[in-house]
Amino acid sequence: MASYLDFEKNIQQIDEDLANAKIKGDDEAVKILEKNLEKETQKVYKNLSDYQRLQLARHPDRPYALDYIQAILSDAYEIHGDRAFRDDPAIVCYAGYIGGKKIIVIGEQKGRGTKDKLHRNFGMPHPEGYRKALRVAKMAEKFNIPVLFLVDTPGAYPGVGAEERGQSEAIARNLYELSALKTITIAVVIGEGGSGGALAIGVADKLAMMKNSVFSVISPEGCAAILWNDPSKSEAATKAMKVTADDLKTQGLIDDVIEEPMSGAHRDKENAIKNLSDYVLKAIEELEQYDKRELAALRMQKIFKFGAFAE
């Protein structure tokens, strides 16, 4: 059953009326309602606020990492474990082919349904998840295979066990190692990009965001609680923090914005997945002109420009 956000109520009503008309076999009503649905969808999605985009980034029907992997990879083979502690299911790693090209995909997976969400810790990786990601990325470097990172997490898991096993060290190690990785790397924020938990697999030659995704150093609710002692002011915090793809592109913090279907990725997964796949293939083709040492040097130059300012 489809889930609807508060600003999608009119769309929900038309969807329900359309479903009833189809059941009754009322072709005339179906035509009218389909036109109404298209108009209402354009009206709602044409001028989304930052907070509404945040809601879309968290939408439960939005395609997750495994949805993209299963759709774009052929001959996919999953790679497990960090070879030190355990296999963290919040991070998934696959080797396969995209458009006939070898690729390794590393993604954060939130899970669907109660059991799967608990199994994957709601997409909040433990340190062993980040170590698994780094192990697989280093494997890709060894065989000169491009790496695609799919970022989608509310943040790294802040539990006691995770801290005892070196959560901050694991994130820092990934930032250090991925910055100098000698192979093509592409990172795409497909939903939530939550702070260090996202950065740990977000260092790449190309950093892109899906149109309705977000990337921030803290959740808007957390920001509102700290600054105003009022989590209910999260809408104002979202706007002030500039967390959307368009804002981050304007600030030069990401390279590209991947367009989503008018109604959002959650209502048209097939085209959203196609857009991401097309972007990845184009990015690989563009980056193949550089040798691996040039890639690492250019990536480092880009990183050192972040945060630079002049008065």
Swiss-Prot record:
Q: Name one GO molecular function term.
A: ATP binding
Question: Does the keyword Oxidoreductase feature in the UniProt annotation?
Answer: no
Question: Which terms in the GO cellular component ontology are assigned?
Answer: acetyl-CoA carboxylase complex
Does the record bear Heme in its keywords?
no
Q: Which reaction does it catalyse?
A: N(6)-carboxybiotinyl-L-lysyl-[protein] + acetyl-CoA = N(6)-biotinyl-L-lysyl-[protein] + malonyl-CoA
Q: What is its EC number?
A: 2.1.3.15
Short name of any one Pfam family annotated for the protein: ACCA
Entry's Gene Ontology BP terms: fatty acid biosynthetic process; malonyl-CoA biosynthetic process
**Top EC category:** transferase
The UniProt record lists the CoA carboxyltransferase C-terminal domain at 36-286
Q: Where in the cell is it found?
A: Cytoplasm
Q: In which pathway does it act?
A: Lipid metabolism; malonyl-CoA biosynthesis; malonyl-CoA from acetyl-CoA: step 1/1
Q: Which key words tag this protein in UniProt?
A: ATP-binding, Cytoplasm, Fatty acid biosynthesis, Fatty acid metabolism, Lipid biosynthesis, Lipid metabolism, Nucleotide-binding, Transferase
SUPFAM superfamilies listed in its UniProt record: ClpP/crotonase
Q: What does this protein do?
A: Component of the acetyl coenzyme A carboxylase (ACC) complex. First, biotin carboxylase catalyzes the carboxylation of biotin on its carrier protein (BCCP) and then the CO(2) group is transferred by the carboxyltransferase to acetyl-CoA to form malonyl-CoA.
Q: How does it assemble?
A: Acetyl-CoA carboxylase is a heterohexamer composed of biotin carboxyl carrier protein (AccB), biotin carboxylase (AccC) and two subunits each of ACCase subunit alpha (AccA) and ACCase subunit beta (AccD).
PANTHER family for this protein: ACETYL-COENZYME A CARBOXYLASE CARBOXYL TRANSFERASE SUBUNIT ALPHA (PTHR42853), ACETYL-COENZYME A CARBOXYLASE CARBOXYL TRANSFERASE SUBUNIT ALPHA, CHLOROPLASTIC (PTHR42853:SF3)
What family, per the record?
Belongs to the AccA family.
Q: What is this protein called?
A: Acetyl-coenzyme A carboxylase carboxyl transferase subunit alpha
Gene coding for it: accA
